[in-house]
Amino acid sequence: MVKEISFSEPTLPFVLDEVPTNSATSGKLPSYIADHRRRLRARFMTGGPAAMPDYELLELVLFRAIPRKDVKPFARALLDRFGDFNRVISAPAPRLRDIPGLGDAVIIELKIIEAAAQRMARAKVMQRHVVSSWEALLDYCHTAMAHRETEQFRILFLDRKNVLIADEEQAQGTVDHVPVYPREVAKRALELNASALILVHNHPSGDPTPSQADRDITRQIQAACETLGVTLHDHLIIGKSEELSFRSAGYL
């Protein structure tokens, strides 16, 4: 039987509201915590994120997940463990659970922020000409990959007009290796009717300098694609704060 929704049912909380809780069981939020939260929210609304250090921005994210406690210790613990706001947001769930007292509610909030950032960056490059949107493409790659703790290999598929038609994760690996199979890359290009590719992978160490293995796999993929009439435009290695282009560096 389909449940009829009543207009008297409680609505979801607005983004700046507290998450509803049962006051009988949770108790009243101490005034000093409530005042602190109001001040942070007011400062965010007035000055935006630029007016706030990482630990305060992280507190704002944690407010909804931890509605009845002081979140400052959690924010500090997360930053002490991972270094900065970006690394906290992109940290793997198992490592986030290593923080004492931090549960799924917090992890979900953090991962929602990460997913939103990636979707916004991706929307700026999909179905766009890669040359005219090159900076946006680099921003997307950094948003999606720069703070990962393991290597990820992505392939950007382009049509004849160099418009990005697909962005796919090919493989995930360890901290310094990711398995890639040139024939599978070329096969997928044919399936998507792609005319060109851009390879992208990250270096968790933060240094985008290509290894010998990086150069070897690039040549192998280029050879596999050439037999099918598919062009390899570039291979980007994403570091923590910069990237390396095989094309610009003379490797292609």
Residues covered by each model-derived region:
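Structure-specific DNA junction-binding interface
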Residues: 1-80, 87-98, 105-119, 123-198, ...
